[in-house]
Amino acid sequence: KSLELIKTDKKKFCLIHGKEINHPVGSSINRRIKKILSETEKIIANSEYTKNLAINKGIDKDKVKVINPGVHTVEKLDHKSLGRVESLLKIKSPRLITVSRFDKRKNHEKIIMALRNLKQLYPNIVYICIGHGEEEDNLKKLVQELDLSSQVMFFKDISNNLKNALIAKSNIFVMPSIIHKTSVEGFGISYVEAAQYGVPSLGGKDGGASDAIEHGKTGIICDGNNLDEIYSSLKLMIENKKYIELGKNAKKFVSKFQWFEIIKE
């Protein structure tokens, strides 16, 4: 909408993230988006996935360039927050974590369902959920129904220091995103933020996670709609503490997402 209102002879550049262009080809909103974007000099997509999505929706491929989002240098961990995390988690291990809104696309539900079987192998496993959103009550209800109250911890409205400490002290960042209606994970900056602390990720194939995760090297890309695949992927990452090797690789890999590197593009 804002691009439509910009009346100028100056060059216009537009950033696209995924879900805002994910509408049926030929629909009124699709035609409107194509018209607006045709008037821009360049379209910056946040991932290869978003670029391909744009092209499939009829947007001029010659105008689209991929520049991934960047991150700032990782914040130094606060000793007080680290101490609080150790007190909260105690002997709980392995530790899974998601930092995101609680909505269908983020797929917390499937992780919780996989946890039911994982706890048979790893009785001290814990899943840390940080965020808020419309699915919060449903997720808490599911946790109760599956008798996982001891395995799932919910946090919201917490400080950045505590959030970062929880990430740093976790073993695997989990967000096997799916497409929900028109909502799609265009990139997934959370994977990069976790990797800065040496935490590998489980991401979903439906979206731009593959730009942020090297499958089999810095994490695993799976089918977020397939519960068995989520379970087996997590089991693989946990067995023999494979997440340690993946985490080391992830920390090296994401150095290219530092803003001082991204800005060169």
Feature locations, PLM:
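Conserved donor-binding/catalytic core segment of Leloir-type glycosyltransferases
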Residues: 44, 88-106, 112-115
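Carbohydrate-associated surface elements
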Residues: 49, 70
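A short helix/loop element that forms part of the nucleotide-sugar donor recognition site in Leloir-type
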Residues: 76-90
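A short, well-ordered alpha-helix in the C-terminal region of glycosyltransferases
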Residues: 94, 124, 151, 229, ...
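Nucleotide-activated donor-binding/catalytic signature segment of Leloir-type glycosyltransferases, i.e.
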Residues: 140-158, 172
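Acidic donor-binding loop of glycosyltransferase active sites
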Residues: 168-183, 199
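Short hydrophobic beta-strand element within catalytic cores of glycosyltransferases
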Residues: 191, 196, 200-203, 213
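Conserved acidic donor-binding segment of nucleotide-sugar-dependent glycosyltransferases
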Residues: 214-216, 220-227, 236-241
